[in-house]
Amino acid sequence: MNKTITALAIIMASFAANASVLPETPVPFKSGTGAIDNDTVYIGLGSAGTAWYKLDTQAKDKKWTALAAFPGGPRDQATSAFIDGNLYVFGGIGKNSEGLTQVFNDVHKYNPKTNSWVKLMSHAPMGMAGHVTFVHNGKAYVTGGVNQNIFNGYFEDLNEAGKDSTAVDKINAYYFDKKAEDYFFNKFLLSFDPSTQQWSYAGESPWYGTAGAAVVNKGDKTWLINGEAKPGLRTDAVFELDFTGNNLKWNKLAPVSSPDGVAGGFAGISNDSLIFAGGAGFKGSRENYQNGKNYAHEGLKKSYSTDIHLWHNGKWDKSGELSQGRAYGVSLPWNNSLLIIGGETAGGKAVTDSVFISVKDNKVTVQN
C-alpha cells in the first residue's frame, strides 16, 4: 500500500532541514481543500473555483502547477484525502444544475499519474459540508457537518425570496433562531472504503456534531477541535477519537479558545506537540446563547484569532501568535510541523501566503 495521508494527517517523512514556507498560491485561496502525498502538496476548490494546483516541496525551484479542473463545479468546504496514490474529494457546497446552492454528498477521484478526474458511483448517506475527513487503515472517515436538508432548504427559501428584504429577514430569523440540537449537525462517523466505494456506519459521537472543526490525526488517535455547534455559534470543545485495539472510543478533552470557541481553525502536530491555531468566531455569542438568545451572533462582528495553543500536561496553553488572525485555509503536515496554506483574514479577505508552525521543547516558532 502506498503511503496514505489526509489533508490534516501527520506525516513523519523527511524533508529538507531548511524547508521554507511555500510560494504564494496562484489565486487568493480560502474555503478550499488540500492534501499532501509524499513530497507533493495539492490544493483546490474554494475561492479557486474548479482549479487545482500541485507543488513539489522537494523541487529546487518550487512553483505551483495547474492540474486538470475539477469536473463537479466550484465547491466550498469540500474535504480531500490521499489513499493508495489517488486523491479523493468529498462533498462540499456549490450550485446544482438549477443554480441553487446546495450541499453535495458525492465523491470524486483524481489520478495524479493521468492528471484526470472521475466521479465515483458513490454517495454518502448524508450531505458533506463543514465535515472533516481523515484516513485510518486505508479507509477515509467522515464526521461532522451541516444537515443537508435544513441547509438546502434555507437556500431554496432565499432563492424564492429574491430581493424581497422583508422575506429575507424573516427567513434568516427563522433559520438562526433555533437551539443547537434543532440543526441536526452530523454526529455520525462514516467510513468510506475506496476498494469497494461503499460507505459504512463506524460509530457516533456521544455528544453532538460540529461543523468547521479542525482535525488532525496521528497513529490510532484523531482530534476534532472546536467548530460550530449551530450556525453562528461555536464550541470550545475538543474531542478525541481513539482507535487503539480496533475499539473506537470517544473522549472529551479540556476545552480551548474558551468561552466562545472558533471555527475554521488549523491543527497539526510538531515533535509530538498538538497544535491548534487561528479560527474565526463571534465574541459574546456563547453568553448570548446561554442567556436564551438562540440567534446568538446577531449583531456581533466576526473576529479572527491569532492565538496558537499547545496541548501540554492535560491542558491547553497559549504558546504563541500568528502575525494576523486567519481561518478557513488548509492545514497540512509538513517537515514534522504544521503548514497553513491560504485562508481568510478580517473582512473575509482571501490570502495567498502560507504559515509554518513548529514546536521544540514546548516553544513555538512561526515562519511567514
Curated annotation (Swiss-Prot):
Keywords: Carbohydrate metabolism, Isomerase, Kelch repeat, Periplasm, Repeat, Signal
Active site, UniProt feature: E228 (proton acceptor)
Kelch repeat residue numbers: 40-84, 86-137, 139-173, 174-219, 222-265, 287-336, 338-367
Subcellular locations according to the entry: Periplasm
EC number: 5.1.3.24
UniProt catalytic activity: N-acetyl-alpha-neuraminate = N-acetyl-beta-neuraminate
Family matches, as Pfam families: NANM (PF24996)
Presence of keyword RNA-binding: no
Signal sequence range: 1-19
Chief place where the protein resides: periplasm
One GO term describing the cellular component: periplasmic space
InterPro entries on file: Kelch-typ_b-propeller, NANM, NanM_proteobact
Top-level taxonomic group: Bacteria
Molecular function terms, GO-annotated: racemase and epimerase activity, acting on carbohydrates and derivatives
Family (UniProt): Belongs to the NanM family.
PANTHER family according to UniProt: LD33804P
Binding partners and assembly: Homodimer.
Described function: Converts alpha-N-acetylneuranimic acid (Neu5Ac) to the beta-anomer, accelerating the equilibrium between the alpha- and beta-anomers. Probably facilitates sialidase-negative bacteria to compete successfully for limited amounts of extracellular Neu5Ac, which is likely taken up in the beta-anomer. In addition, the rapid removal of sialic acid from solution might be advantageous to the bacterium to damp down host responses.
Name this polypeptide is given: N-acetylneuraminate epimerase
Taxonomic lineage: Bacteria, Pseudomonadati, Pseudomonadota, Gammaproteobacteria, Enterobacterales
